[in-house]
Amino acid sequence: MESVRHRIALLFANEADIQDVETVEDGVIVFPNSNITIQDRWTYAIDYELDSIRRISWRNPSSTRQFSVIESRLAPGFNIYSNDKEARLNLFGIQPVYSPMYKSLHSETWKSINEILPGGKNLNIPWNPELCDYDILITANTVQVFSYCSLVEKKKFVKDAGKVEIGLFHVDTEDEEDINLSGLRCTWEDTSNNIGKCEKTTLFYKPFHLYVDDSSDIAPITIENTNGLHPKMKIDLSGIRKDKDCRHFVFSQLPSEIFVDKFQSPGSIVFGLDDLELPDYKVNSLSWGSESIVTLKEGQINEITYFSRYLEPKERASNKTVGFEPILFKACQVGKEEDLSNPFYSRSLGYEAYFSENTKFYHINSTSVHVNIPYPNKNDIGNIEYTTFGIVVLAICYLIYKLLRPSRKLSTVKRD
């Protein structure tokens, strides 16, 4: 890496909490008096072309951290995206899912970033996947790393390699069009490790990710037949009116054990593993699963039907629990003249890529759902095989009998 610049932004719950920040000679000390989101942004300038990877994101699937106005809505898990159609993307020993917009790899567990980047480049970032989310955007000669964490204990921010400034913000005003952040911006001196004067600052921007309050009550998500091979997810939009500039969608990354039945789920698009016949133990080495995006209808309850794959038999009857987190959102078109760029996050590959640049995303609900898939009992396999074999033999014998049996001729009796 040739050079790095490091900026920090802290989002406080209110203006009063910023007053509790202590400014010392070499930095600032912040106390976790309320819910505080920390965004670290590292920008690396490099002098060579990177390969096909264009975005890497991580959000802990078990995280309960709430999204804030300074961050993008990341898909859960560890995700790698590429839009290079020529290059291969077969990390983790599995094949990617291909869609018209990108190819992707997904894992529920954290992977080493330094091992994924070309040449094993070390970014010298203190990764903390348990508590933080990450969004890494890669262009030809630049790597940008966005980190989002919650402040859980008192922390002192001091200068390190490339660190230039820290912003302390709170939401002054917010609506569906604009967000106004007010606060302080402090910079470190170039010639020393001391922090300079902190100045008042204000930021106006138009977000393209917005989060609806009390969302679980607006559009509840439920799952039915959770112990069968054909579970159904119901999304209740009966209380939502149709808008000519907006449509509702649900995006899901599904493990190999389950996939959307696109024939029974109108408006669904599925990429990846969707073979109806193959059991899970035949496909889980081929790819990680599938992606689906379903167009929903406002004013009614929407049903999405899934197929569960047959699992490898076990000695005793049991179930395997698999889960996923559908992302329910409303996508709205805005005027092309409206600038949706902002200093905190950028649009990139992922579900955002299915929509135009002038799209706003209103996130309504993201409820984790689970289904139980039964394991076949190994002890029953013999009986099933013998029964199936017997039925097949009887069917063949019956067909042979029908084919070889002498045909009856119809006779007529002439009456006098």
UniProtKB/Swiss-Prot annotation:
The chain crosses the membrane at residues 382-404. Pathway: Glycolipid biosynthesis; glycosylphosphatidylinositol-anchor biosynthesis. It is a single-pass type III membrane protein. Its main location: endoplasmic reticulum. Glycans are attached at residues 35, 180, 319, 365. Disulfide bonds: none annotated. It is found in: Endoplasmic reticulum membrane. This is Protein PBN1. The lineage of its organism: Eukaryota, Fungi, Dikarya, Ascomycota, Saccharomycotina. The gene is PBN1.
